[in-house]
Structure formats: structure tokens, C-alpha cells
């Protein structure tokens, strides 16, 4: 039998994995996997588990949200020739699952995909020095939604928690002067949102069209949302973001391998839905397909 390392975040998604956990384990066993469980107890546990033990297994998988998957990938980036990654998404919004078409909050269905799926090359983002992101690094409007929403509210309200928190932020959108240097050019101006991503979705609010994103092409999508300048124009800008109208004058989508952001003051970032700290300057890059994701 193949050896499967399964890292479980017991607090993700209101603990919903418990309801069909036995059936999911049977699905994996019937598919030829002998599973060893690792339960996280705090931040970065998944990273350390993956770094320390993944090389001993044929496949590494995790049960949790995008943050758990991000931690696992961060650990695998520290070892040579990492095994392929399976994902049982049990988070609140599950942006990665939305991008790759995995069943969400369905332990049996996702376990079946680990058995029947194919490993696909998956780009990983570099976040400053020695830190990584699986699918997005972002700042500005809406980016605080994921890590600013209280955990108890996430568990109790699910996706609605993000919508409520996002609605609160509409009244306090801040314009941020920034210089952005990327592969083919430079942007200088005021932004209300910026990101570098390998995903079609962030917090279920900002979305890119499926045909714009390829997960293993060595390119990331740089999204820059400019300050409209007037109160009346904010409605047009918000509509462009929410309806994915990328021909809007306020919205730029640029493919790049590298981006450097320079602000006039420290600015808060989110890294895969978690607090990424504040940075006055930050360099992001695309690592071309260092891991493989099963779907």
C-alpha cells in the first residue's frame, strides 16, 4: 500500500470533517493508501509536520482551509522532491478548491479525488525572504476580510461572515500611494487594492475569470485596482471588481513572474487569507511548479 501523511486542522470549517471522517478514511484505504494522521494544535504546525516528515510518505494530504494547505506547501518548499499534495477542503471559503474544482466541505468526495485524481504542477508564490504563499498575497480593500473576521464568527456563519465583514469595509476604503515594479513595466499611483495571485478567487469576493489563470505556467496574475478619485466613481470601481469587468479603467490585470511594491508607509498584507504583516517594501515572485497538487 502507498503511505499517506494526512495533516488535520481540527478547528477548520466548524470541525465539519468529523461527520464523515470514518467513511473518508475507508475511501482512502480502499484506494490503496495506508494513512498516518497528524493533528495540528496551532499556527505553523502543518508547516513543521510537512518539513519534518513528508519525505517518508508517497503522498501528503491535509484537511483544513486554505491556510492549512498554505502551511503544508510552505513545509514542502523546504525539502527536495516533495511528494504530491492531496487536499480535503474544510475551510470557510476555500479559494483554492474553487479554483481547481475540488468538492468543498465534502470529506468523502475530496478523499475520492485524492485516490482518483492526477498530480498537477502547481506554482508557489515567494513572499519576501523565506516565506511563501499558495495562491494569493494582497493588500488594501477586502484583503482584511479573511483575517479580520473573528474565528468564532467564521465557524458560526461560514461564508456569510466574509460577506458581512466585507460590507463593513466598503465604508472605509483607503487609497494607498505605491510604486509597483513588475516584469514588463512600472505602475505609480494610488491603489485601493493590489494582489499577486495564482487563483481565481480571494475570500470569495474578488474573482478572476477561469481562462485568465493557469496554475502551473510560471506566471502569476498581478491585480491593481486604482483609486477612482471621486465618490461617485467608487460605485463603478466596486461593480467592476465584483462583476469581473476587467475592461474597466480602474482595474488592471497583468501577468508577471515578479513584483516589487514600494509604499510611503508600512501597509498591511494578507498571505493566503492570514495576516501577512505590514511592509513598506515587499518583493513577491513566482516559483514555477515546485510542488504538485492532486485534483
PLM ranges: what are they?
Residues 182, 214, 224-295:
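ATP/nucleoside-binding phosphotransfer catalytic cores, i.e., glycine-rich phosphate-binding loops
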Residues 138, 142, 195-211, 275:
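Glycine-rich phosphate/pyrophosphate-binding beta-alpha loops
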Residues 174-176, 190-192, 216-221, 255-259:
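A generic structural signal for short beta-strands and their flanking turns/coil linkers
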Residues 153-160, 201, 205-232:
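Gly/Ser/Thr-rich active-site loops/lids in small-molecule metabolic enzymes
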Residues 68-80:
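Short Gly/Thr/Asp-enriched flexible loops that form oxyanion-binding sites at enzyme active sites
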Residues 1-63:
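ATP/NTP phosphate-donor binding region
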Residues 31, 40, 78-196:
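Catalytic core of DAGKc-family lipid kinases
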Amino acid at each position: 500500500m502507498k503511505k499517506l501523511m494526512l495533516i488535520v486542522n481540527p478547528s477548520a470549517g466548524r470541525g465539519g470533517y468529523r461527520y464523515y471522517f470514518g467513511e473518508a478514511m475507508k475511501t482512502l484505504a480502499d484506494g490503496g493508501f495506508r494513512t498516518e494522521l497528524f493533528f495540528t494544535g496551532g499556527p505553523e504546525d502543518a508547516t513543521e509536520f510537512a518539513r519534518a516528515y513528508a519525505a517518508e510518505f508517497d503522498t501528503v494530504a491535509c484537511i483544513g482551509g486554505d491556510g492549512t494547505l498554505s502551511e503544508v506547501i510552505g513545509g514542502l518548499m523546504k525539502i527536495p522532491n516533495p511528494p504530491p499534495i492531496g487536499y480535503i477542503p474544510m475551510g470557510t471559503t476555500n479559494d483554492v478548491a474553487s479554483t481547481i474544482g475540488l468538492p468543498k466541505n465534502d470529506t468523502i468526495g475530496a478523499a475520492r479525488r485524492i485516490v482518483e485524481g492526477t498530480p498537477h504542477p502547481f506554482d508557489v508564490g515567494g513572499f519576501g525572504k523565506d516565506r511563501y504563499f499558495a495562491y494569493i498575497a494582497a493588500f488594501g480593500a477586502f484583503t482584511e476580510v479573511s483575517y479580520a473576521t473573528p474565528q468564532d464568527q467564521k465557524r458560526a456563519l461560514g461564508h456569510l461572515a466574509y460577506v458581512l465583514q466585507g460590507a463593513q469595509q466598503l465604508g472605509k476604503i483607503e487609497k494607498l500611494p505605491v510604486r509597483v515594479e513588475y516584469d514588463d513595466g512600472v505602475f505609480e499611483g494610488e491603489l485601493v487594492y493590489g494582489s499577486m495571485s495564482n487563483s481565481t478567487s480571494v475570500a470569495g469576493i474578488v474573482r478572476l475569470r477561469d481562462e485568465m489563470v493557469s496554475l502551473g505556467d510560471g506566471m502569476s496574475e498581478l491585480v491593481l485596482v486604482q483609486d477612482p478619485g471621486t465618490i461617485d466613481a467608487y460605485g463603478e470601481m466596486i461593480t467592476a471588481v465584483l462583476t469581473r469587468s476587467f475592461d474597466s479603467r480602474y482595474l488592471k490585470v497583468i501577468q508577471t513572474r515578479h513584483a516589487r511594491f514600494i509604499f510611503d508607509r508600512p501597509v498591511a498584507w494578507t498571505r493566503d487569507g492570514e495576516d501577512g504583516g505590514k511592509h513598506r517594501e515587499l518583493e513577491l515572485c513566482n516559483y514555477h511548479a515546485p510542488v504538485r497538487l492532486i485534483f
